[in-house]
Structure formats: structure tokens, C-alpha cells
């Protein structure tokens, strides 16, 4: 993982997103529980688009910005929730006979082949910006429905609390700082990617959340689950707080 971080970091340096000094500082002071790219976004050192471009070069996969809320419901219905949540991927369009799946990290060829076999459809993978797939999975596929952040923002504009331009800035900031629970668990060092992928296959057949499934099966402790959930809550901005701050003439930074 350290080698992968260094490689991604070097790509970001080469692309001019950060300096060598900033990379060294990030590797030294990176917050526990965040991967290097995610930490750089969280710290305001790079944008989600700069990270997507670096990951695109690293994985040789096309990067693009998506609006998960604009995906047709018919397309969502054609892609099972079990696959979406397992592979952390969203169907965004079809290109001829191929289904295009957006993810925030590259989906490996073996997994792409497995999805293609299940759906009996050729698959193409593209990289979305950090947070875009996360908010899309929560909106379209999550069992647990909280306040819809986009609706909160639209309501604030309709009420005259925010201008459309302010809302766009807030949405960009909010989305780029959303983190998948599995990413935090991996970054905390509690579970490696290969083990997590195997466990996700088992979880497909249950109604439990990933955290609950891992605790029930003694993969992680309740304390570890709590630590990961608290970190996720701490690093993810609240939409209502962002709206209050901006409408009160505060600056999002």
C-alpha cells in the first residue's frame, strides 16, 4: 500500500497538483484512516478532479465527472443493488452493447469479467471524481435513507437562503469529501482489500450493513466499528452545517 501511495503521490507531483515537499508532508502527517489521495482532498491540497486524473493515469482508465442524481431510473433498475454496493460502482450509460460503470477506484479486470458474466453484458469502467459514486450509491441503493443532501440544497435555494452559484460551490465541496465506509476500514489497517472483497461477496446474501456483518462474523470488534464510524462522521461535512455557514456569509474552505 505504501508503494501504491508513493506512486500516486509521484503522479500528482508530475501533474503539478502538489510539490515534492507537500507529498512528503502528506505521507508523514496523513490522518489515520484516510488514503493519501483522500487525505489530500480533505486537507484542501488537491481537488477531486486532480485526484481522478492521477488515478486515471495510474490505472490507465478514462476519468470523467458524473452527476449521479441525473442517472435514469431505468438504468439504475437494470443494475442490481448487490453488484452496485459490492463493487462500489454506478451504471451511468450504455455505449452500444456495453454498460458503462463509474467507480472512484479502478475495478480490476477479474471483477469486470465477473460483472459481465452476471449481467450477460460487456462492461466498461470509467473513473468518477472522489465522492460522486459514494453519494450516488447512498441516493439510489442504500437501505438506510437519511436526509437527501441535494434536496436540502435545493430547498435552501428555493427559500432564498442561497444563490444557485453558492449551492454549486457547496455541492462540489460536500461531494468531494464523502468517504465510503470500506475505504476508511482499509485505511485504518483493520482489513486488507483482498479480504474485504471476499467478505463483500458473502455479505451480498445478507440484509446487514457492512459494519454489522463484519462485527457479527468477528472480523472486526464493535470498538473498531465505532472508531471507523466516528472517523467517517468527523471527516464528512454536514450539508445542513454547510448551508448554515454559507447563508450566514461564512466561506466554504
Spans of features found by a protein language model:
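Non-catalytic accessory regions
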Residues: 1-253
